[in-house]
């Protein structure tokens, strides 16, 4: 049984940057709180917890004088509230997410109705919507504009950074089809993360060459779920968070296994999965 890892695997640039910032802050201050989980990966959060990093869900729960913003970012009103309380804010927002926030603000300042292709309940999308002044729509439904009464003829479209490119392209086409009858002016900002795009491409290429694909990452991670959906289109694919979730029944008749990971999956977890697969192969 041969195991091959995709070329883009492990932490993405944004996650690695956020973790480095948080580790440094925790070491300097003897611990730090984060407003929301830094990333959607429990193994990483457990390790950070051991370094004195504590996750709080609400601003009211902050007990210290320093708080870190997660890599998913927040809206301007949240930032203003934190600063009004005299808190030191450590911003670990991913630069690609920042770019999406800037695009949303630019649309808003120009008087455009902002349409975000993304999960309305995801913290990244909530933050981006905040930079659009709350005047917009976040949806994955290509017919979403139909349900918006009196939508502006000026429309700005952008995407949650971790979405699948073909999905965003299809979404944009549908927005144009719906809006043209309103004599609309449409602006489109490509806010997809380049790292995630390359990761998806590499995973899809590998999935086409193996009998089984394993996606390692958090079950609640958006970019990890997108990798699962993509790989499923060409290969038998399973999502696991740790080696303990791997079922030996999946491996019957399998000669080649491909591995990819979500952007917040650490190298230790990936190595443990590879080692476990190696032990199974040696025992056959």
From Swiss-Prot:
Catalytic-site annotation from UniProt: 124
Record-listed E.C. numbers: 1.17.7.4
Transmembrane residue ranges: none
Binding-site list for [4Fe-4S] cluster: 12, 94, 193
Record keywords, A-Z: 4Fe-4S, Iron, Iron-sulfur, Isoprene biosynthesis, Metal-binding, Oxidoreductase
Enzyme class: oxidoreductase
Ligand binding ((2E)-4-hydroxy-3-methylbut-2-enyl diphosphate): 40, 72, 122, 161, 221, 223, 264
Residues in coiled coil: none
Known pathway: Isoprenoid biosynthesis; dimethylallyl diphosphate biosynthesis; dimethylallyl diphosphate from (2E)-4-hydroxy-3-methylbutenyl diphosphate: step 1/1; Isoprenoid biosynthesis; isopentenyl diphosphate biosynthesis via DXP pathway; isopentenyl diphosphate from 1-deoxy-D-xylulose 5-phosphate: step 6/6
MF-aspect GO terms: 4 iron, 4 sulfur cluster binding; 4-hydroxy-3-methylbut-2-enyl diphosphate reductase activity; metal ion binding
Obligatory cofactor(s): [4Fe-4S] cluster
The keyword Cell membrane belongs to this UniProt entry's keyword annotation: no
GO biological process, one term: terpenoid biosynthetic process
Binding-site list for dimethylallyl diphosphate: 40, 72, 122, 221, 223, 264
Binding residues annotated for isopentenyl diphosphate, in chain numbering: 40, 72, 122, 221, 223, 264
Cofactor note: Binds 1 [4Fe-4S] cluster per subunit.
Family per record: Belongs to the IspH family.
General function of this protein: Catalyzes the conversion of 1-hydroxy-2-methyl-2-(E)-butenyl 4-diphosphate (HMBPP) into a mixture of isopentenyl diphosphate (IPP) and dimethylallyl diphosphate (DMAPP). Acts in the terminal step of the DOXP/MEP pathway for isoprenoid precursor biosynthesis.
Protein name: 4-hydroxy-3-methylbut-2-enyl diphosphate reductase
Gene label: ispH
């Amino acid at each position: 049984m041969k195991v091959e890892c995709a070329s883009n695997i492990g932490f993405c640039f944004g996650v690695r940057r956020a973790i480095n910032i948080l580790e440094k802050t925790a070491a300097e201050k003897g611990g730090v709180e984060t407003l929301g989980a830094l990333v959607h990966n429990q193994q990483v959060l457990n390790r950070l917890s051991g370094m004195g990093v504590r996750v709080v869900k609400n601003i009211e729960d902050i007990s210290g004088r320093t708080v870190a913003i997660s890599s998913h970012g927040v809206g301007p009103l949240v930032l203003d509230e934190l600063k009004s309380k005299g808190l030191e804010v450590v911003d670990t927002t991913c630069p690609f997410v920042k770019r999406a926030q800037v695009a949303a603000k630019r649309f808003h300042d120009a008087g455009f109705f902002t349409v975000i292709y993304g999960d309305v309940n995801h913290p990244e999308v909530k933050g981006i919507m905040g930079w659009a002044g709350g005047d917009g729509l976040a949806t994955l439904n290509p017919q979403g504009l139909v349900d918006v009464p009196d939508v502006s003829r000026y429309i700005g479209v952008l995407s949650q950074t971790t979405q699948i490119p073909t999905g965003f392209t299809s979404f944009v086409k549908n927005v144009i089809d719906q809006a043209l009858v309103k004599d609309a002016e449409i602006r489109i900002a490509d806010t997809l993360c380049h790292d995630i795009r390359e990761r998806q491409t590499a995973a899809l290429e590998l999935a086409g060459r193996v009998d089984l694909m394993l996606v390692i990452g958090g079950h609640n991670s958006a970019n990890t779920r997108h990798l699962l959906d993509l790989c499923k289109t060409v290969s038998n694919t399973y999502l696991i968070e740790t080696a303990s979730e791997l079922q030996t029944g999946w491996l019957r008749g399998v000669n080649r296994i491909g591995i990819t990971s979500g952007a917040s999956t650490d190298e230790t977890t990936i190595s443990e999965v590879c080692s476990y697969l190696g032990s199974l192969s040696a025992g056959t």
